[in-house]
Amino acid sequence: MWSSEVTNMIITGIWETLYMTLVSTLVGYVIGLPMGIILTVSDKDGIKPNAVLYKILDVIANIVRGVPFIILLVLLIPFTRLVVGKSYGSTATIVPLVIAAAPYIARMVESSLKEVDAGVIEAARSMGASNFTIITKVMLVEARTSLLVGATITLGTILGYSAMSGAVGGGGLGAIAIRYGYTRWQTDIMIVTVILLIILFQIFQTVGMKLADKFDHRK
């Protein structure tokens, strides 16, 4: 039977994992949602094409997404230390998680918004709707189911990234799995942390998909 110290450590690891995942996803959407909207609007088939702006954001998104997350973690250590004063722990890990999440979210949002029927957008435009109204009242509303599915996928991805951050000083269940499973060869603790990560992932997926189904305008 494990000691109370190990049990408390795992409980703390769960909360740290939730903290990193949820905060990173929330802040990532603060950046990624507007970025995705701008990518959609400024594309050649968007409601306000702007080739230069689209290309700049497109390149930024591709560069960040093209760097493996474990390398991005190491690459951003100086920047993370500058922002939060240290490069280790759950709070510090949020910095690279947000930077990794934002362009990923932007692409998810762009993909969702481009699924909106062009006829619906044209109908709104013919009735005199402004671009802002088309974005907020038509595109985002029509794409809400796809956006919720994207958010669900994003949560799962960020959860995996948060676990990966344990390899370079991040907190949470990932750090416990690596410290005890890889370094100390305590397989039982590693297996429990992996199971807990799977459970968290399943909870995110189940809740997210139920919400997406609830707000599906086609039903």
Language model: regions and residue ranges:
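Transmembrane alpha-helices
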Residues: 131-161
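Short helix-to-coil transition segments within interhelical loops
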Residues: 113-143, 183
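C-terminal transmembrane helix and the adjacent membrane-cytosol boundary/short C-terminal tail
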Residues: 38-44, 126, 190-219
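Membrane-water interface segments at the C-terminal ends of transmembrane alpha-helices
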Residues: 9-114, 149-156, 196-204
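Hydrophobic alpha-helical elements at and bordering transmembrane segments
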Residues: 10, 14, 18, 56, ...
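Glycine-rich helix-loop "coupling/hinge" segments at transmembrane-helix boundaries
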Residues: 161-191, 195-196, 216
